């Protein structure tokens, strides 16, 4: 899986960062999934190779506007781009009427079926490539993290099973390797039944706003990547005395170290943290605080940067 960050700022955009939106991209092909959709997300997409037509589902972590105000525009543009395949939108039930009424009030026609699913009732979402589950977080409003787990990654033909069942090597094997259904000796064989993963599935957790990383203790075990907010540094919280339901870089880093998280990606940075290291406070303060508590692979997400999770389990920037 790849991650492409479309927005990494908390609350409001800055000149360098837009508000929250993260693309999770399938290992093979161009299909992708969107976690959160802050205002301006569709404009950020124009600077990436991602197509709205290839978007398979949208997941919204909570109701705050910096995570969802981009939805109406994105949906309208999806319709104008010629999308016709159904789109599933998993979001808090409190936003369902807001989405519907916004489309109606603006006389927006969607040439595709929009399926609204309540995140509060989501036990599991899946297709042939991924399984998605939720973990409850702690914020001023209900918030969740989404756990993306690959299904049957990089499938290879189970030749031992084929030989054991007496299915001769030849064109049938080629069809089954594509996942197609074929006929053999009067029986229909589903290609998916003869495919097995060639490596362990990868698991990526993309979190909404959260002031208690320990809530991730169970799902973080064995996860390949944890994407978590680091809105503040400890120094700022000690000076202001408030967190507004958010985490510090230190708190997230301590948790990730204790949980054995191999790749930690911090995002959702307060607009006060400048990109220029000569300014104070700056984004290097966030990095330094996290590195003081975490010894794994640390990444501070950047807008429009794509990251690839390699076979060696390391998350690296692309390009």
UniProtKB/Swiss-Prot annotation:
<keyword id="KW-0479">Metal-binding</keyword>
<dbReference type="Pfam" id="PF12706">
    <property type="entry name" value="Lactamase_B_2"/>
</dbReference>
<comment type="function">
    <text>Zinc phosphodiesterase, which displays some tRNA 3'-processing endonuclease activity. Probably involved in tRNA maturation, by removing a 3'-trailer from precursor tRNA.</text>
</comment>
<dbReference type="GO" id="GO:0042781">
    <property type="term" value="F:3'-tRNA processing endoribonuclease activity"/>
</dbReference>
<keyword id="KW-0540">Nuclease</keyword>
<dbReference type="GO" id="GO:0008270">
    <property type="term" value="F:zinc ion binding"/>
</dbReference>
<keyword id="KW-0378">Hydrolase</keyword>
<feature type="binding site">
    <location>
        <position position="268"/>
    </location>
    <ligand>
        <name>Zn(2+) 2</name>
    </ligand>
</feature>
<dbReference type="InterPro" id="IPR036866">
    <property type="entry name" value="RibonucZ/Hydroxyglut_hydro"/>
</dbReference>
<keyword id="KW-0255">Endonuclease</keyword>
<feature type="binding site">
    <location>
        <position position="62"/>
    </location>
    <ligand>
        <name>Zn(2+) 1</name>
    </ligand>
</feature>
<feature type="binding site">
    <location>
        <position position="64"/>
    </location>
    <ligand>
        <name>Zn(2+) 1</name>
    </ligand>
</feature>
<feature type="binding site">
    <location>
        <position position="66"/>
    </location>
    <ligand>
        <name>Zn(2+) 2</name>
    </ligand>
</feature>
<protein>
    <recommendedName>
        <fullName>Ribonuclease Z</fullName>
        <ecNumber>3.1.26.11</ecNumber>
    </recommendedName>
</protein>
<feature type="binding site">
    <location>
        <position position="67"/>
    </location>
    <ligand>
        <name>Zn(2+) 2</name>
    </ligand>
</feature>
<comment type="subunit">
    <text>Homodimer.</text>
</comment>
<dbReference type="InterPro" id="IPR013471">
    <property type="entry name" value="RNase_Z/BN"/>
</dbReference>
<dbReference type="InterPro" id="IPR001279">
    <property type="entry name" value="Metallo-B-lactamas"/>
</dbReference>
<comment type="similarity">
    <text>Belongs to the RNase Z family.</text>
</comment>
<feature type="binding site">
    <location>
        <position position="209"/>
    </location>
    <ligand>
        <name>Zn(2+) 1</name>
    </ligand>
</feature>
<feature type="binding site">
    <location>
        <position position="139"/>
    </location>
    <ligand>
        <name>Zn(2+) 1</name>
    </ligand>
</feature>
<keyword id="KW-0862">Zinc</keyword>
<feature type="binding site">
    <location>
        <position position="209"/>
    </location>
    <ligand>
        <name>Zn(2+) 2</name>
    </ligand>
</feature>
<keyword id="KW-0819">tRNA processing</keyword>
<feature type="active site" description="Proton acceptor">
    <location>
        <position position="66"/>
    </location>
</feature>
């Amino acid at each position: 899986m790849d991650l492409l960050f479309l927005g990494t700022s908390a609350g409001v955009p800055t000149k360098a960062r837009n508000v929250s939106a993260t693309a999770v991209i399938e290992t093979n092909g161009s299909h992708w999934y969107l976690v959160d959709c802050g205002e301006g997300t569709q404009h950020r997409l124009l600077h990436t190779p991602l197509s709205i037509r290839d978007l398979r589902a949208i997941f919204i972590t909570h109701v705050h506007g910096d995570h969802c105000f981009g939805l109406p525009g994105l949906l309208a543009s999806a319709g104008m781009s010629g999308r016709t395949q159904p789109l599933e939108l998993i979001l808090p039930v409190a936003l369902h009427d807001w989405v519907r009424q916004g489309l109606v009030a603006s006389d927006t026609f969607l040439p595709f079926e929009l399926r609204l699913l309540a995140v509060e009732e989501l036990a599991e979402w899946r297709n042939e490539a991924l399984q998605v589950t939720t973990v409850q977080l702690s914020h001023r409003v209900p918030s969740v993290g989404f756990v993306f787990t690959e299904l049957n990654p990089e499938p290879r033909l189970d030749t031992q099973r084929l030989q054991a069942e007496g299915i001769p090597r030849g064109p049938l094997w080629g069809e089954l390797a594509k996942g197609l259904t074929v006929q053999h000796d009067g029986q229909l064989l589903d290609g998916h039944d003869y495919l097995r993963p060639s490596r362990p599935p990868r698991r990526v957790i993309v979190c909404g706003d959260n002031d208690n990383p320990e809530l991730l203790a169970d799902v973080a075990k064995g996860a390949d990547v944890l994407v978590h907010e680091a809105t503040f540094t400890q120094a700022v919280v000690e000076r202001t005395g408030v967190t507004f339901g958010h985490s510090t870089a230190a708190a997230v880093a301590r948790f990730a170290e204790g949980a054995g998280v191999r790749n930690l990606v911090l995002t959702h940075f307060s607009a006060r943290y400048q990109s220029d290291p000569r300014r104070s406070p700056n984004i290097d303060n966030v990095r330094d605080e996290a590195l003081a508590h975490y010894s794994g692979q640390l990444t501070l997400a950047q807008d429009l940067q794509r990251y690839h999770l390699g076979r060696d389990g390391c998350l690296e920037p692309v390009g």
